[in-house]
Amino acid sequence: MKRRKFIHNSSLLAFSVGVFGTIKWDGHAYVGNDPTTTDILGPFYRPGAPFRVDLVQPGTKGDILHFSGTVLSKDGSTPMKDALVEIWHCNEDGVYDNTSDEYIYRASSNTGADGKYHFKTILPVPYKAGATLTRPAHIHMRISGTQLQDLVTQVYFKGDKHISEDMSSSNPRSLNRILDIGKNDNNEKVVKFDIVLKEEYVLDATAFKKITGLYEMSDRSMSDFYKDGDELFVKLNGQIMEAMEYKGNNKFEGGLGVISVQFELLSNGGAKVKVSYIDDDRKTVTLEGNKILKYPA
C-alpha cells in the first residue's frame, strides 16, 4: 500500500514524536554525545515484529545491507544492555508489508552487554508518497525497554537526491542521521549508527489513566490514546500513527516540531484534547476532541 493513500484513509497525516538533543558543529562535521534526535513514526509501524537479525528475503533484488551500531546511555559512552531495538522499512519496490504474518523487513532484537545491535537486511529505496512528494530511502527505528526515554527515529543515506525535498530528512535536526554507506570484504553495504538515549520524563500512572481513552475529534475522526512504554501512542481510526513524549502540564510533543497534544482534565472525570500538527504543505492544522470512552484501570 502506498503511504499517501494509507494516510489519506486515516484522515490525518502521520507524524511521530520525541524531543531532540542539540547538534554541535566542530568546524568540520556535526558531532557530540547529545541525545539522538527523533523523527516521524509514520503510518506503517507494527508492534510485535519477530526477534531476528536476518531480514533478507529469498530471491530479493535489493542490495544486502549490514545495519549495526551501539545503544548508549545519556552520558554517550555507557552501553545499554537489553535495549529493545525494532526496525522496519520498505522492500526493493518501495512497499511496506503491513498485513502478512511474516512481518517482511521488520525485526526486533535486544542489545547485548556491549550495547550493540546488528541486522542483515537490504538497502531500502525511495518511494512516492503522493503526486509530487518522494520520500528518501530510510529505516525506521524504535528503541525501548530501558530506564531511559524511549526513542522513535529514522536514518537516511548520504547521496540520496530526495533528502532535500523531504520535510523530515531536510530538517537540520536530522543531519546526524544522514549516514555514509560503506562496504565490507564481501562487497556488501554497511551502515553504522550509534544511538544516545536521554533521561526519562514521564507522566505519573494515575494521570496517564485519566487521559487515555477514545476521543471523537472535531473532524469526526476517532483518536485512541494509549500508553506504550513511557510514551503516549495514538491510533487514528484504528491505525497506529504517533508516539509522543511527555513535556509537562498534561502536554505531549512530537519530534521535529510537527505535533503537540494538550489534554484538559475535567471535574466530572472526562477529558478534552487539542491536537496541533504541521501537514505536508507545512501548514498548521488544529483539531479538538472529547473523550467518549474510558478504558478499565
Question: Can you describe what each PLM-predicted range is?
Answer:
Residues 27-169:
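Beta-strand-dominated extracellular/periplasmic modules and repeats
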Residues 20-24:
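C-terminal segment of classical bacterial N-terminal signal peptides
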Residues 1-17:
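N-terminal secretory signal peptides and thylakoid transit peptides that target proteins
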